[in-house]
Amino acid sequence: MPSDSMTDLPETRANAPEWTVSELSFALRRTVEDAYGHVRVRGEISGYRGPHSSGHAYFSIKDEGARLDAVIWKSAFARLKLRPEEGLEVVAVGKLTTYPGKSGYQIVIESLEFAGAGAIMAMLEERKRRLAAEGLFDAARKQELPFLPKVIGVVTSPTGAVIRDILHRLSDRFPRQVIVWPVRVQGETSAAEVAEAIRGFNALPEGGPIPRPDVLIVARGGGSLEDLLGFSDEAVVRAAAESFIPLVSAVGHETDVTLIDFAADVRAPTPTAAAEMVVPVRADLLAGIDAYGERLSAAPRRLLERRRADFRALARHLPTADALLAVPRQRLDAAGERLPRALRANAAAHRLAFEAVRTRHSASAFRLRLARAQDRVAALGGRLQWGLTGLVSRRSERLSAMTARFGSARAASLRAHVLHLSRCRERLSVLSTRAQRAVRHDLRERTNRLAAMEQLLKALSYRGVLARGFALVRDAQGGAVRAAGAVVPGARLELEFADGRLGVQALGEGAPVEPPQAARPSKGARTKAAQPSLFDD
Protein backbone atom coordinates (compact mmCIF):
# COMPACT_ATOMS: atom_id res chain seq x y z
CA MET A 1 0.00 0.00 0.00
CA PRO A 2 2.64 2.51 0.86
CA SER A 3 4.46 1.70 -2.27
CA ASP A 4 1.37 2.44 -4.31
CA SER A 5 0.89 5.83 -2.63
CA MET A 6 4.42 6.83 -3.23
CA THR A 7 4.02 5.78 -6.80
CA ASP A 8 0.87 7.92 -7.35
CA LEU A 9 2.25 11.14 -5.72
CA PRO A 10 4.31 12.36 -8.63
CA GLU A 11 1.40 11.81 -10.95
CA THR A 12 -0.88 13.93 -8.66
CA ARG A 13 1.62 16.76 -8.56
CA ALA A 14 2.00 16.59 -12.25
CA ASN A 15 -1.77 16.76 -12.81
CA ALA A 16 -2.25 19.86 -10.51
CA PRO A 17 -3.41 22.94 -12.48
CA GLU A 18 -0.95 25.72 -13.09
CA TRP A 19 -1.75 29.22 -11.69
CA THR A 20 -0.26 32.57 -12.38
CA VAL A 21 0.46 34.76 -9.38
CA SER A 22 -2.34 37.14 -10.27
CA GLU A 23 -4.81 34.31 -10.83
CA LEU A 24 -3.97 32.76 -7.49
CA SER A 25 -4.14 36.13 -5.70
CA PHE A 26 -7.54 36.98 -7.13
CA ALA A 27 -8.79 33.45 -6.42
CA LEU A 28 -7.76 33.82 -2.79
CA ARG A 29 -9.44 37.23 -2.70
CA ARG A 30 -12.73 35.79 -3.94
CA THR A 31 -12.46 32.94 -1.46
CA VAL A 32 -11.90 35.31 1.49
CA GLU A 33 -14.62 37.74 0.45
CA ASP A 34 -17.12 34.93 -0.17
CA ALA A 35 -16.29 33.18 3.08
CA TYR A 36 -16.42 36.21 5.40
CA GLY A 37 -18.16 39.07 3.62
CA HIS A 38 -18.95 41.87 6.14
CA VAL A 39 -17.42 41.47 9.59
CA ARG A 40 -17.24 43.36 12.90
CA VAL A 41 -13.73 43.47 14.31
CA ARG A 42 -12.88 44.80 17.77
CA GLY A 43 -9.43 46.15 18.49
CA GLU A 44 -7.19 49.14 19.16
CA ILE A 45 -6.27 51.59 16.41
CA SER A 46 -2.53 51.64 15.81
CA GLY A 47 -0.30 53.55 13.43
CA TYR A 48 -2.91 56.20 12.55
CA ARG A 49 -1.38 59.40 11.19
CA GLY A 50 -4.45 61.02 9.71
CA PRO A 51 -5.82 60.86 6.19
CA HIS A 52 -3.38 60.41 3.29
CA SER A 53 -2.99 63.16 0.68
CA SER A 54 -5.36 61.12 -1.48
CA GLY A 55 -8.04 61.31 1.22
CA HIS A 56 -7.79 57.63 2.17
CA ALA A 57 -6.78 56.52 5.66
CA TYR A 58 -4.40 53.62 6.37
CA PHE A 59 -3.72 52.10 9.80
CA SER A 60 -3.96 48.82 11.75
CA ILE A 61 -6.31 47.27 14.28
CA LYS A 62 -4.58 45.15 16.88
CA ASP A 63 -5.15 43.21 20.05
CA GLU A 64 -2.83 41.22 22.30
CA GLY A 65 -2.23 38.46 19.76
CA ALA A 66 -2.56 39.80 16.21
CA ARG A 67 -2.64 42.82 13.90
CA LEU A 68 -5.02 43.50 11.00
CA ASP A 69 -4.34 46.06 8.30
CA ALA A 70 -7.23 48.47 7.70
CA VAL A 71 -8.12 51.03 5.08
CA ILE A 72 -10.89 53.62 4.89
CA TRP A 73 -11.61 54.97 1.43
CA LYS A 74 -12.10 58.71 1.02
CA SER A 75 -15.83 58.39 0.30
CA ALA A 76 -16.41 56.35 3.48
CA PHE A 77 -14.14 58.55 5.63
CA ALA A 78 -16.39 61.57 5.08
CA ARG A 79 -19.41 59.62 6.35
CA LEU A 80 -17.83 58.35 9.56
CA LYS A 81 -19.61 59.28 12.79
CA LEU A 82 -16.50 58.39 14.77
CA ARG A 83 -13.16 59.53 13.43
CA PRO A 84 -10.18 57.23 14.11
CA GLU A 85 -7.67 58.25 16.74
CA GLU A 86 -4.42 56.62 17.80
CA GLY A 87 -4.96 54.18 20.67
CA LEU A 88 -8.76 54.32 20.46
CA GLU A 89 -10.51 50.97 21.04
CA VAL A 90 -13.20 50.56 18.40
CA VAL A 91 -15.45 48.10 16.65
CA ALA A 92 -14.74 48.31 12.91
CA VAL A 93 -17.50 47.28 10.52
CA GLY A 94 -16.39 46.45 6.99
CA LYS A 95 -15.52 43.96 4.32
CA LEU A 96 -12.59 41.56 4.61
CA THR A 97 -10.47 41.33 1.48
CA THR A 98 -6.92 40.81 0.30
CA TYR A 99 -4.29 43.11 -1.14
CA PRO A 100 -2.51 41.30 -3.95
CA GLY A 101 0.31 43.80 -4.05
CA LYS A 102 1.59 42.62 -0.66
CA SER A 103 0.07 39.16 -0.46
CA GLY A 104 -1.82 40.22 2.68
CA TYR A 105 -5.34 40.57 3.85
CA GLN A 106 -7.06 43.69 5.20
CA ILE A 107 -10.40 45.08 6.20
CA VAL A 108 -12.03 47.87 4.23
CA ILE A 109 -13.81 49.81 6.98
CA GLU A 110 -17.20 51.32 6.32
CA SER A 111 -18.02 52.52 9.86
CA LEU A 112 -16.43 52.80 13.31
CA GLU A 113 -18.03 52.42 16.71
CA PHE A 114 -16.72 52.76 20.21
CA ALA A 115 -15.92 49.46 21.82
CA GLY A 116 -18.17 50.19 24.81
CA ALA A 117 -18.34 53.06 27.30
CA GLY A 118 -14.89 52.23 28.60
CA ALA A 119 -13.34 53.03 25.26
CA ILE A 120 -15.15 56.34 25.12
CA MET A 121 -14.01 57.26 28.62
CA ALA A 122 -10.44 56.31 27.84
CA MET A 123 -10.51 58.46 24.72
CA LEU A 124 -11.98 61.40 26.60
CA GLU A 125 -9.42 61.08 29.40
CA GLU A 126 -6.58 61.07 26.90
CA ARG A 127 -8.03 64.10 25.10
CA LYS A 128 -8.62 65.92 28.38
CA ARG A 129 -5.04 65.27 29.48
CA ARG A 130 -3.63 66.53 26.18
CA LEU A 131 -5.76 69.70 26.08
CA ALA A 132 -5.08 70.44 29.73
CA ALA A 133 -1.35 70.23 29.01
CA GLU A 134 -1.87 73.02 26.46
CA GLY A 135 -3.40 75.24 29.17
CA LEU A 136 -6.91 75.35 27.74
CA PHE A 137 -8.45 74.56 31.12
CA ASP A 138 -6.34 76.98 33.23
CA ALA A 139 -8.23 79.06 35.76
CA ALA A 140 -6.33 82.17 34.61
CA ARG A 141 -8.21 82.01 31.30
CA LYS A 142 -11.62 82.17 32.97
CA GLN A 143 -13.67 85.36 32.58
CA GLU A 144 -16.27 86.76 34.93
CA LEU A 145 -19.85 86.88 33.75
CA PRO A 146 -21.35 90.37 33.28
CA PHE A 147 -23.75 91.40 36.03
CA LEU A 148 -26.58 92.38 33.69
CA PRO A 149 -25.94 91.56 30.01
CA LYS A 150 -27.93 93.40 27.36
CA VAL A 151 -27.69 90.64 24.75
CA ILE A 152 -27.43 86.90 25.42
CA GLY A 153 -26.28 84.48 22.72
CA VAL A 154 -27.55 80.89 22.90
CA VAL A 155 -26.01 78.02 20.91
CA THR A 156 -28.53 75.16 20.86
CA SER A 157 -31.21 73.50 18.79
CA PRO A 158 -34.02 75.94 17.92
CA THR A 159 -36.71 73.26 18.16
CA GLY A 160 -35.87 71.51 21.42
CA ALA A 161 -37.20 72.01 24.91
CA VAL A 162 -33.88 73.53 26.01
CA ILE A 163 -34.38 76.87 24.25
CA ARG A 164 -37.94 77.11 25.57
CA ASP A 165 -36.72 76.51 29.14
CA ILE A 166 -34.00 79.15 28.77
CA LEU A 167 -36.34 81.78 27.29
CA HIS A 168 -38.98 81.07 29.92
CA ARG A 169 -36.48 81.37 32.75
CA LEU A 170 -35.01 84.59 31.38
CA SER A 171 -38.50 86.06 31.01
CA ASP A 172 -39.30 85.22 34.64
CA ARG A 173 -36.07 86.64 36.07
CA PHE A 174 -35.06 89.57 33.87
CA PRO A 175 -36.12 89.79 30.19
CA ARG A 176 -33.13 90.36 27.91
CA GLN A 177 -32.52 90.29 24.18
CA VAL A 178 -31.67 86.72 23.14
CA ILE A 179 -29.99 85.70 19.87
CA VAL A 180 -30.18 81.99 19.06
CA TRP A 181 -27.58 80.40 16.77
CA PRO A 182 -29.30 77.21 15.59
CA VAL A 183 -27.13 74.08 15.57
CA ARG A 184 -27.52 70.33 15.61
CA VAL A 185 -26.76 69.10 19.12
CA GLN A 186 -26.31 65.48 18.03
CA GLY A 187 -24.98 63.76 14.96
CA GLU A 188 -22.05 63.88 12.60
CA THR A 189 -22.03 67.67 12.05
CA SER A 190 -22.90 68.64 15.62
CA ALA A 191 -19.35 69.42 16.78
CA ALA A 192 -18.48 71.47 13.69
CA GLU A 193 -21.70 73.50 13.93
CA VAL A 194 -21.25 74.23 17.65
CA ALA A 195 -17.62 75.33 17.15
CA GLU A 196 -18.63 77.50 14.19
CA ALA A 197 -21.45 79.09 16.22
CA ILE A 198 -19.09 80.03 19.07
CA ARG A 199 -16.58 81.55 16.65
CA GLY A 200 -19.40 83.27 14.73
CA PHE A 201 -20.69 85.04 17.83
CA ASN A 202 -17.15 86.20 18.66
CA ALA A 203 -16.68 87.50 15.11
CA LEU A 204 -19.70 89.83 15.31
CA PRO A 205 -18.50 93.46 15.33
CA GLU A 206 -19.57 95.77 18.11
CA GLY A 207 -22.20 98.23 16.91
CA GLY A 208 -23.04 96.12 13.86
CA PRO A 209 -26.50 95.29 12.50
CA ILE A 210 -26.53 92.14 14.65
CA PRO A 211 -25.64 93.06 18.23
CA ARG A 212 -22.70 91.24 19.73
CA PRO A 213 -23.73 89.16 22.79
CA ASP A 214 -22.35 90.01 26.21
CA VAL A 215 -22.47 86.35 27.30
CA LEU A 216 -22.89 82.99 25.55
CA ILE A 217 -24.79 79.87 26.62
CA VAL A 218 -23.95 76.54 24.95
CA ALA A 219 -26.82 74.27 25.94
CA ARG A 220 -28.19 70.80 25.30
CA GLY A 221 -30.51 68.48 27.15
CA GLY A 222 -29.51 65.19 28.72
CA GLY A 223 -28.51 62.12 26.73
CA SER A 224 -26.22 59.13 26.58
CA LEU A 225 -22.46 59.37 26.55
CA GLU A 226 -22.46 58.92 22.78
CA ASP A 227 -25.13 61.62 22.34
CA LEU A 228 -23.06 64.17 24.26
CA LEU A 229 -19.80 63.23 22.58
CA GLY A 230 -19.95 66.15 20.15
CA PHE A 231 -19.49 68.63 23.03
CA SER A 232 -16.22 66.90 23.93
CA ASP A 233 -14.87 67.34 20.41
CA GLU A 234 -11.50 69.05 20.25
CA ALA A 235 -12.77 71.75 17.87
CA VAL A 236 -15.60 72.65 20.28
CA VAL A 237 -13.24 72.74 23.27
CA ARG A 238 -10.76 74.99 21.48
CA ALA A 239 -13.50 77.36 20.29
CA ALA A 240 -14.84 77.65 23.85
CA ALA A 241 -11.36 78.31 25.27
CA GLU A 242 -10.62 80.97 22.63
CA SER A 243 -13.93 82.80 23.09
CA PHE A 244 -13.57 86.47 24.02
CA ILE A 245 -17.18 86.50 25.16
CA PRO A 246 -17.80 84.89 28.58
CA LEU A 247 -19.22 81.42 27.95
CA VAL A 248 -21.50 79.24 30.09
CA SER A 249 -21.58 75.50 29.42
CA ALA A 250 -24.96 73.86 30.07
CA VAL A 251 -24.77 70.42 28.45
CA GLY A 252 -26.86 67.56 29.81
CA HIS A 253 -27.77 67.06 33.44
CA GLU A 254 -25.71 67.72 36.54
CA THR A 255 -24.12 64.26 36.38
CA ASP A 256 -23.16 64.59 32.71
CA VAL A 257 -19.60 65.82 32.11
CA THR A 258 -18.20 66.97 28.76
CA LEU A 259 -14.87 68.57 27.91
CA ILE A 260 -16.51 71.89 27.04
CA ASP A 261 -17.35 72.18 30.75
CA PHE A 262 -13.63 72.49 31.53
CA ALA A 263 -12.95 75.07 28.80
CA ALA A 264 -16.02 77.22 29.53
CA ASP A 265 -15.79 80.16 31.94
CA VAL A 266 -18.69 78.80 34.02
CA ARG A 267 -20.36 75.38 34.05
CA ALA A 268 -24.08 75.20 34.72
CA PRO A 269 -25.63 71.90 35.82
CA THR A 270 -28.66 72.43 33.53
CA PRO A 271 -29.74 74.89 30.80
CA THR A 272 -32.27 76.39 33.22
CA ALA A 273 -29.52 76.98 35.76
CA ALA A 274 -27.46 78.68 33.03
CA ALA A 275 -30.29 81.17 32.47
CA GLU A 276 -30.33 81.85 36.21
CA MET A 277 -26.58 82.43 36.24
CA VAL A 278 -26.45 85.02 33.45
CA VAL A 279 -29.20 87.38 34.74
CA PRO A 280 -30.31 88.40 38.23
CA VAL A 281 -33.90 88.49 39.43
CA ARG A 282 -35.42 91.80 38.40
CA ALA A 283 -37.74 91.88 41.41
CA ASP A 284 -34.79 91.33 43.75
CA LEU A 285 -32.90 94.18 42.09
CA LEU A 286 -35.87 96.52 42.43
CA ALA A 287 -36.29 95.52 46.06
CA GLY A 288 -32.60 96.10 46.64
CA ILE A 289 -32.79 99.50 44.98
CA ASP A 290 -35.77 100.42 47.16
CA ALA A 291 -33.88 99.25 50.24
CA TYR A 292 -30.84 101.29 49.24
CA GLY A 293 -33.09 104.29 48.59
CA GLU A 294 -34.65 103.99 52.02
CA ARG A 295 -31.25 103.67 53.62
CA LEU A 296 -30.00 106.63 51.61
CA SER A 297 -32.93 108.81 52.66
CA ALA A 298 -32.77 107.60 56.27
CA ALA A 299 -29.05 108.25 56.60
CA PRO A 300 -29.35 112.09 56.60
CA ARG A 301 -32.17 111.90 59.12
CA ARG A 302 -30.13 109.68 61.42
CA LEU A 303 -27.15 111.97 61.03
CA LEU A 304 -29.30 115.00 61.85
CA GLU A 305 -30.72 113.27 64.93
CA ARG A 306 -27.23 112.39 66.13
CA ARG A 307 -26.09 115.97 65.61
CA ARG A 308 -29.10 117.25 67.54
CA ALA A 309 -28.43 114.82 70.38
CA ASP A 310 -24.78 115.87 70.47
CA PHE A 311 -25.83 119.52 70.49
CA ARG A 312 -28.26 118.97 73.36
CA ALA A 313 -25.59 117.10 75.31
CA LEU A 314 -23.13 119.92 74.79
CA ALA A 315 -25.77 122.50 75.69
CA ARG A 316 -26.42 120.74 79.01
CA HIS A 317 -22.77 121.10 79.95
CA LEU A 318 -22.64 124.82 79.09
CA PRO A 319 -23.00 127.30 82.04
CA THR A 320 -26.10 129.53 82.23
CA ALA A 321 -26.12 133.23 81.43
CA ASP A 322 -26.50 134.21 85.10
CA ALA A 323 -23.50 132.07 86.00
CA LEU A 324 -21.44 133.62 83.25
CA LEU A 325 -22.40 137.20 84.22
CA ALA A 326 -22.19 136.85 87.98
CA VAL A 327 -18.49 137.69 88.32
CA PRO A 328 -18.56 140.53 85.75
CA ARG A 329 -21.55 142.01 87.57
CA GLN A 330 -19.67 141.98 90.87
CA ARG A 331 -16.68 143.62 89.21
CA LEU A 332 -18.97 146.25 87.71
CA ASP A 333 -20.55 147.01 91.07
CA ALA A 334 -17.14 147.33 92.72
CA ALA A 335 -15.93 149.60 89.93
CA GLY A 336 -19.08 151.70 90.31
CA GLU A 337 -18.33 152.18 93.99
CA ARG A 338 -14.69 153.18 93.30
CA LEU A 339 -15.53 155.52 90.42
CA PRO A 340 -16.69 158.62 92.46
CA ARG A 341 -13.60 158.49 94.64
CA ALA A 342 -11.37 158.10 91.63
CA LEU A 343 -13.05 161.02 89.89
CA ARG A 344 -12.58 163.29 92.90
CA ALA A 345 -8.95 162.28 93.26
CA ASN A 346 -8.34 162.85 89.57
CA ALA A 347 -9.95 166.30 89.71
CA ALA A 348 -7.80 167.28 92.71
CA ALA A 349 -4.65 166.14 90.94
CA HIS A 350 -5.54 168.14 87.86
CA ARG A 351 -6.19 171.25 89.97
CA LEU A 352 -2.76 170.95 91.59
CA ALA A 353 -1.13 170.56 88.21
CA PHE A 354 -3.00 173.59 86.90
CA GLU A 355 -1.88 175.70 89.84
CA ALA A 356 1.72 174.68 89.25
CA VAL A 357 1.48 175.62 85.60
CA ARG A 358 -0.19 178.92 86.39
CA THR A 359 2.53 179.70 88.91
CA ARG A 360 5.23 179.00 86.35
CA HIS A 361 3.55 181.27 83.81
CA SER A 362 3.06 184.34 86.04
CA ALA A 363 4.48 187.82 85.03
CA SER A 364 7.33 187.83 87.52
CA ALA A 365 8.36 184.35 86.52
CA PHE A 366 8.19 185.35 82.89
CA ARG A 367 10.41 188.42 83.46
CA LEU A 368 12.90 186.30 85.34
CA ARG A 369 13.11 183.80 82.54
CA LEU A 370 13.45 186.65 80.00
CA ALA A 371 16.38 188.16 81.89
CA ARG A 372 18.10 184.82 82.07
CA ALA A 373 17.55 184.34 78.36
CA GLN A 374 19.04 187.77 77.61
CA ASP A 375 22.11 186.94 79.64
CA ARG A 376 22.56 183.70 77.76
CA VAL A 377 22.16 185.52 74.42
CA ALA A 378 24.79 188.11 75.40
CA ALA A 379 27.20 185.40 76.44
CA LEU A 380 26.61 183.52 73.25
CA GLY A 381 27.13 186.74 71.22
CA GLY A 382 30.52 187.31 72.81
CA ARG A 383 31.60 183.75 72.20
CA LEU A 384 30.38 184.00 68.62
CA GLN A 385 32.34 187.20 67.99
CA TRP A 386 35.52 185.70 69.34
CA GLY A 387 35.01 182.57 67.31
CA LEU A 388 34.31 184.45 64.09
CA THR A 389 37.41 186.56 64.53
CA GLY A 390 39.61 183.49 64.98
CA LEU A 391 37.95 181.71 62.07
CA VAL A 392 38.49 184.67 59.73
CA SER A 393 42.12 184.84 60.70
CA ARG A 394 42.70 181.12 60.12
CA ARG A 395 40.86 181.18 56.82
CA SER A 396 42.90 184.20 55.64
CA GLU A 397 46.14 182.35 56.34
CA ARG A 398 44.93 179.25 54.50
CA LEU A 399 43.78 181.41 51.58
CA SER A 400 47.17 183.06 51.27
CA ALA A 401 48.91 179.66 51.23
CA MET A 402 46.49 178.27 48.69
CA THR A 403 46.90 181.38 46.51
CA ALA A 404 50.63 180.82 46.40
CA ARG A 405 50.24 177.14 45.49
CA PHE A 406 47.52 177.86 42.99
CA GLY A 407 49.58 180.34 41.05
CA SER A 408 52.10 177.79 39.82
CA ALA A 409 49.50 175.08 39.28
CA ARG A 410 47.27 177.48 37.39
CA ALA A 411 50.03 178.38 34.96
CA ALA A 412 50.77 174.72 34.18
CA SER A 413 47.09 173.91 33.83
CA LEU A 414 46.57 176.87 31.56
CA ARG A 415 49.36 175.73 29.25
CA ALA A 416 47.91 172.23 29.12
CA HIS A 417 44.46 173.58 28.33
CA VAL A 418 45.82 175.78 25.57
CA LEU A 419 47.59 172.80 24.00
CA HIS A 420 44.44 170.65 24.28
CA LEU A 421 42.31 173.40 22.73
CA SER A 422 44.71 173.69 19.82
CA ARG A 423 44.49 169.96 19.12
CA CYS A 424 40.71 170.00 19.40
CA ARG A 425 40.52 172.90 16.98
CA GLU A 426 42.56 170.94 14.42
CA ARG A 427 40.38 167.80 14.82
CA LEU A 428 37.25 169.94 14.59
CA SER A 429 38.47 171.46 11.33
CA VAL A 430 39.12 168.00 9.84
CA LEU A 431 35.72 166.66 10.98
CA SER A 432 33.96 169.77 9.65
CA THR A 433 35.53 169.28 6.24
CA ARG A 434 34.49 165.61 6.15
CA ALA A 435 30.97 166.44 7.30
CA GLN A 436 30.55 169.10 4.61
CA ARG A 437 31.68 166.65 1.90
CA ALA A 438 29.32 163.93 3.22
CA VAL A 439 26.38 166.35 3.41
CA ARG A 440 26.98 167.60 -0.12
CA HIS A 441 27.27 164.00 -1.42
CA ASP A 442 24.09 162.91 0.36
CA LEU A 443 22.27 166.02 -0.85
CA ARG A 444 23.24 165.28 -4.46
CA GLU A 445 22.04 161.66 -4.17
CA ARG A 446 18.74 162.71 -2.60
CA THR A 447 18.28 165.39 -5.30
CA ASN A 448 18.87 162.82 -8.06
CA ARG A 449 16.45 160.30 -6.47
CA LEU A 450 13.85 163.05 -6.03
CA ALA A 451 14.16 164.06 -9.68
CA ALA A 452 13.82 160.41 -10.80
CA MET A 453 10.77 159.90 -8.61
CA GLU A 454 9.29 163.15 -9.92
CA GLN A 455 9.72 161.93 -13.50
CA LEU A 456 8.17 158.54 -12.58
CA LEU A 457 5.27 160.27 -10.84
CA LYS A 458 4.63 162.46 -13.85
CA ALA A 459 4.73 159.41 -16.13
CA LEU A 460 2.28 157.45 -13.98
CA SER A 461 -0.05 160.32 -13.04
CA TYR A 462 -3.34 160.61 -14.86
CA ARG A 463 -2.66 164.37 -15.21
CA GLY A 464 -0.13 163.56 -17.90
CA VAL A 465 -2.97 161.91 -19.83
CA LEU A 466 -5.15 164.99 -19.27
CA ALA A 467 -2.38 167.19 -20.63
CA ARG A 468 -2.58 165.24 -23.90
CA GLY A 469 -6.21 166.34 -24.41
CA PHE A 470 -8.18 163.71 -22.51
CA ALA A 471 -10.72 164.29 -19.74
CA LEU A 472 -11.57 162.36 -16.52
CA VAL A 473 -15.29 161.73 -15.89
CA ARG A 474 -16.52 161.60 -12.29
CA ASP A 475 -20.00 160.94 -10.90
CA ALA A 476 -21.82 163.05 -8.33
CA GLN A 477 -20.00 161.29 -5.47
CA GLY A 478 -16.56 161.97 -6.98
CA GLY A 479 -15.92 158.42 -8.17
CA ALA A 480 -14.38 157.77 -11.56
CA VAL A 481 -16.79 156.63 -14.32
CA ARG A 482 -15.14 153.81 -16.28
CA ALA A 483 -17.95 152.73 -18.65
CA ALA A 484 -20.85 154.40 -20.47
CA GLY A 485 -23.24 151.78 -19.12
CA ALA A 486 -22.56 153.04 -15.62
CA VAL A 487 -24.19 156.42 -16.40
CA VAL A 488 -27.95 156.87 -16.48
CA PRO A 489 -29.57 159.67 -18.47
CA GLY A 490 -29.94 162.82 -16.42
CA ALA A 491 -27.04 161.98 -14.11
CA ARG A 492 -24.83 164.87 -13.07
CA LEU A 493 -21.20 164.42 -13.95
CA GLU A 494 -17.96 166.31 -13.61
CA LEU A 495 -15.32 166.55 -16.34
CA GLU A 496 -11.75 167.17 -15.25
CA PHE A 497 -9.41 168.69 -17.87
CA ALA A 498 -5.80 169.58 -17.57
CA ASP A 499 -6.66 173.23 -16.87
CA GLY A 500 -9.79 172.82 -14.70
CA ARG A 501 -13.09 171.07 -14.02
CA LEU A 502 -16.51 171.41 -15.64
CA GLY A 503 -19.96 170.22 -14.41
CA VAL A 504 -22.20 168.49 -17.02
CA GLN A 505 -25.40 166.41 -17.20
CA ALA A 506 -25.76 163.13 -19.16
CA LEU A 507 -28.43 163.34 -21.91
CA GLY A 508 -28.31 159.69 -23.02
CA GLU A 509 -26.78 157.73 -25.90
CA GLY A 510 -25.91 159.35 -29.26
CA ALA A 511 -24.16 162.49 -30.47
CA PRO A 512 -24.28 165.56 -28.29
CA VAL A 513 -27.14 168.01 -28.97
CA GLU A 514 -26.16 171.37 -30.35
CA PRO A 515 -27.07 174.09 -27.89
CA PRO A 516 -29.49 176.75 -29.20
CA GLN A 517 -28.03 180.04 -30.34
CA ALA A 518 -28.55 182.57 -27.64
CA ALA A 519 -30.12 185.89 -28.66
CA ARG A 520 -27.61 188.68 -28.84
CA PRO A 521 -28.36 191.23 -26.13
CA SER A 522 -29.26 194.76 -27.09
CA LYS A 523 -26.68 197.40 -26.94
CA GLY A 524 -28.63 199.32 -24.41
CA ALA A 525 -28.75 196.51 -21.88
CA ARG A 526 -26.76 197.49 -18.81
CA THR A 527 -26.79 194.09 -17.12
CA LYS A 528 -26.36 190.56 -18.40
CA ALA A 529 -28.57 187.66 -17.37
CA ALA A 530 -26.87 185.20 -15.07
CA GLN A 531 -25.84 181.96 -16.79
CA PRO A 532 -27.75 178.96 -15.29
CA SER A 533 -25.65 176.16 -13.71
CA LEU A 534 -25.89 172.61 -14.93
CA PHE A 535 -26.41 171.49 -11.36
CA ASP A 536 -29.38 173.83 -10.68
CA ASP A 537 -32.80 172.20 -10.28
From Swiss-Prot:
Belongs to the XseA family. HAMAP family: Exonuc_7_L. GO terms for cellular component: cytoplasm; exodeoxyribonuclease VII complex. This is Exodeoxyribonuclease 7 large subunit. Its EC number is 3.1.11.6. The keyword Nuclease applies. Transmembrane segments: none annotated. One of its GO terms (molecular function) is nucleic acid binding. The lineage of its organism: Bacteria, Pseudomonadati, Pseudomonadota, Alphaproteobacteria, Hyphomicrobiales. It is found in: Cytoplasm. It is an enzyme of class 3 (hydrolase).
